[in-house]
Design a protein with these regions (language model features):
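Short, mixed-charge, low-aromatic patches
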Residues: 1-4, 41-52, 129-130
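Polar low-complexity intrinsically disordered regions
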Residues: 2-17, 21-22, 27-30, 62-81, ...
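Acidic side chains
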Residues: 7, 39-40, 58
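Basic nucleic-acid-binding interfaces
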Residues: 26-41, 45-49
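Acidic, metal-binding active-site segment of PIN/NYN-like and related structure-specific nucleases
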Residues: 46-69
């Protein structure tokens, strides 16, 4: 399985930007899985054991209960026209640059900060853009 899995609702122009800068990228319904897969019922079980980062626009996935030791979920709360830019910026952030740094987290990306849940932590954490 690839390292970066993008939800089917990521626009084509954002995927184009990401594919130019990031290796090991697939999009649900295009390169992997099927269109119409439900996030919780069908996508998340496929991520178990994958060590993948799942990128989504679905705010419903920004919940502590979705933290898992073998994958990461990143929810983008940014303008759709700027998605590609924010994916690249996130992957260059010093706290989330590597796969190991991202694992076990559910992260919300916004223009002002990164907010995240981490497995076995009971409080939400925040970090600023550098």
């Amino acid at each position: 399985m690839k390292s970066h899995i993008f939800d089917e609702n990521f626009p084509a122009f954002a995927m184009h930007t990401v594919r130019q800068k990031v290796a090991s990228v697939v999009q649900i319904g295009q390169d992997w899985g099927e269109n119409g897969w439900l996030d919780v019922e069908e996508i998340l079980p496929q991520l178990h054991g994958s060590r993948a980062t799942f990128h989504t626009l679905d705010a419903g996935l920004f919940k502590r209960r979705y933290c898992h030791g073998s994958y990461c979920i990143v929810y983008y709360d940014v303008l759709e026209t700027e998605l590609g830019k924010w994916v690249i910026k996130f992957l260059k952030h010093h706290n989330f640059r590597t796969q190991v740094q991202r694992l076990s987290k559910v992260i919300r990306i916004s223009p002002t900060k990164l907010t995240y849940w981490e497995l076995h932590a009971y409080a939400i954490r925040k970090t600023e853009w550098q």
